UniProtKB/Swiss-Prot annotation:
Name of the protein this chain belongs to: NALCN channel auxiliary factor 2
Keywords attached to this entry: Glycoprotein, Membrane, Transmembrane, Transmembrane helix
Keyword Nucleotide-binding part of the UniProt annotation: no
Signal peptide: none
Role: Probable component of the NALCN channel complex, a channel that regulates the resting membrane potential and controls neuronal excitability.
Record family assignment: Belongs to the NALF family.
InterPro entries in UniProt: NALCN_aux_factor_1/2
Keyword hit for Iron-sulfur: no
Species this chain originates from: Mus musculus (Mouse)
Glycosylation sites: 120
Length: 471
């Protein structure tokens, strides 16, 4: 009895110990599972944020380190110096009044001498000198010669004609009017000179439709009055009124060329540079943009045209032919807006009368491609079948394996890929994609492991409760 009485308390103590252990070690419903799930959720959010900011940082660093220095190199390489002239097609000679024969005591004017020359004199002078030397003084060339080559005009005017005053005393704000015959003499002279950049506009066009450049009086009557004063008194000086007007027109022409160079640089940066995947034919876009730009700077009607169209038509041509280039602004994000929008087309105010420009047949990339195909020799039946069967394969191969050809061959086969063409992955882009894939794999693996651990911890309270009930 004593032994049995002594053993039962030991069994009760053991049972109490087991119960206490079960009660102490059994996890509560709101313990580790909730904490682990919250910790896993925080890890997921942290890794997702890290992935997002890594992608943004890598893309921004790639743009800063690769695109902008390359664009500056292209800018310095593509922008020509202001002293160099552009190569232009020769302009057909216009019908002008032939110069009268020289006097017996005057030497005949030959090529390379100081005689009058009627041609397009707007090309840049050679680097060796400014022009032929006449009596020890370099003769001006280009558009500057329009006001200095006055030998023919001086012969056409009568020497005995008195020089009328520039401003009669009875009407100080109005120049004297001259007959149309003398104005036609100016027409025959100024129609031979065109601007350097906007070479489709003659000085005669500008004098007729834009006689107030920079608040100057460039009317025909003023120019004729000043010319007659110079002819009547040879020692009075140069044709000052003409020189001032020509300089004003040249300043506007240089401003137009600066704007065109900026547009050309943007097109080369986004459509022809190697850092960007877009390829497009921009020859027609540049030609239309130049015509529209000149029509905005010189709002005059072109006289030397066979057919005319409203100059506003040039703006619509630019809007349809040029690609959409969104502004490069880091502070704002543009979406769905074209890079060129025509405004003021419906403005018919009398302050700005409608001007007419030449109706030009623009050369497009499709027409050049058709012309190149027409010049190829005819293909046999086997060659046509081979071309049609393997066209898709070769197109894909050359798209993913571009070949750089010399400039002489590129001009014959222009790039005809659309603006929304497929992209080419550069090494930096490939490294960025690999980094993104690694981070995504890490997030998925960590989420899977946390989900598996969470399920194991959630089943732990149920097992402990079963053991407690059995005890």
């Amino acid at each position: 009895m004593f032994r049995g009485a002594w053993m039962w308390p030991g069994k009760d103590a053991a049972a109490l110990t087991i119960c206490c252990c079960c009660c102490c070690w059994a996890p509560r419903q709101s313990d580790k599972p909730c904490a682990d799930s919250e910790r896993a959720q925080r890890w997921r959010l942290s890794l997702a944020s890290l992935l997002f900011f890594t992608v943004l940082l890598a893309d921004h660093l790639w743009l800063c380190a690769g695109a902008r220095p390359r664009a500056r190199e292209l800018s310095s390489a593509m922008r020509p110096p202001w002293g160099a002239g552009r190569e232009r097609q020769p302009v057909p000679p216009r019908a002008v009044l032939p110069p009268p024969p020289p006097s017996p005591g005057e030497p005949s004017a030959s090529s390379g001498t100081c005689g009058p020359r009627y041609s397009n004199l707007t090309k840049a002078a050679p680097a060796a000198g400014s022009g032929p030397v006449c009596n020890g003084v370099p003769e001006p060339t280009g558009l500057d010669a329009a006001c200095t080559k006055l030998e023919s005009l001086q012969r056409l005017f009568e020497p005995t004609t008195p020089a009328p005053p520039l401003r009669p005393p009875d009407s100080p704000s109005r120049a004297p009017e001259f007959p149309s015959a003398k104005k036609n003499l100016l027409k025959g002279h100024f129609r031979n000179f065109t601007l350097s950049f906007c070479d489709t506009y003659t000085v005669w066009d500008l004098l007729l439709g834009m006689d107030r450049p920079d608040s100057l009086d460039c009317s025909l009557d003023t120019l004729l009055g000043d010319l007659l004063a110079v002819v009547a008194s040879p020692g009075s000086g140069t044709w000052e009124a003409c020189s001032n007007c020509i300089e004003a027109y040249q300043r506007l022409d240089r401003h137009a060329q600066e704007k065109y160079d900026e547009f050309d640089l943007v097109l080369h940066k986004y459509l022809q540079a190697e850092e960007y995947s877009i390829r497009s034919c921009t020859k027609g876009c540049k030609a239309v943009y130049k015509a529209w730009l000149c029509s905005e700077y010189f709002s005059v009607t072109q006289q030397e045209c066979q057919n005319w169209v409203p100059c506003k038509q040039y703006c619509l041509e630019v809007q349809t032919r040029c690609p959409f280039i969104l502004p490069d602004n880091e502070e704002m994000v543009y979406g769905g807006l074209p890079g060129f929008i025509c405004t003021g087309l419906m403005d018919t105010s009398p302050k700005r009368p409608e001007t007419k420009c030449c109706d030009v047949q623009w050369v497009s990339c499709e027409s050049e491609k058709k012309k190149f195909k027409d010049s190829e020799p005819p293909k046999t039946h086997h060659q046509q079948f081979h071309h049609s069967y393997f066209h898709h394969y070769h197109h894909q191969y050359h798209h993913y394996h571009p070949r750089h050809e010399p400039p002489s061959r590129v001009s014959n086969k222009p790039s005809l890929l659309p603006v929304s063409g497929g992209s080419r992955l550069s090494p930096s882009r490939i490294r960025l994609c690999v980094l993104v894939l690694i981070l995504l794999h890490t997030v998925v693996s960590f989420s899977s492991s946390q989900s598996g651990g969470g399920l194991g911890l959630e089943t732990l309270p149920a097992l402990e409760e079963g053991l407690t009930q059995e005890e």
